[in-house]
Amino acid sequence: SMDELKNFRQWNSLTPGHPEYGLTPGVECTTGPLGSGFSNAAGMALGAKMMGSRFNSSDISLIDSRIFVLCSDGDMQEGIASETASWAGHLRLGNLITLYDSNDITIAGDAGLAMSEDVGKRFEAYGWHVQHCDGHNHDEIADCLEESLSVANKPSLIVAKTVIGKGA
């Protein structure tokens, strides 16, 4: 709601600066530095794959989960995100789907101050399935998510191009 957005980065709100497990509904792990949530998600994806290989059989698929993560320009600037993306591509974690909000803004200002590469091409080089969409178009996002769900042998990156504050 708009009331919650007005409480952005405030303690005990639904929109804290650093959401914490157990305090913010829907948050499955606490992160700290930028990029660490992305790395946590890749670890969860590997964990799900490992559990599936142990407990699934040809008759029963007990563990068949997808791990979804939201990332920002600030996340993608961090070294930990590059290392994780390379590792996830190498392991072919097809159950990892990343929605990247590419709005060219970080907390420090314009993302171009610290990053000039094409993130989608970087992820393609790491072996990821990469798609692009208008991040303000729900149908395009849904189509990209649907396609990502059909890719079993590569992690997926959806580069959702947005304009910060659009419609506010």
Model-identified regions with their sequence ranges:
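N-terminal core-entry segment
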Residues: 6-9
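Carboxylate/His-rich catalytic cores and anion/metal-binding grooves
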Residues: 1-4
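Glycine-rich ThDP/TPP pyrophosphate-binding loop and its adjacent helix/strand module
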Residues: 14-17, 23-168
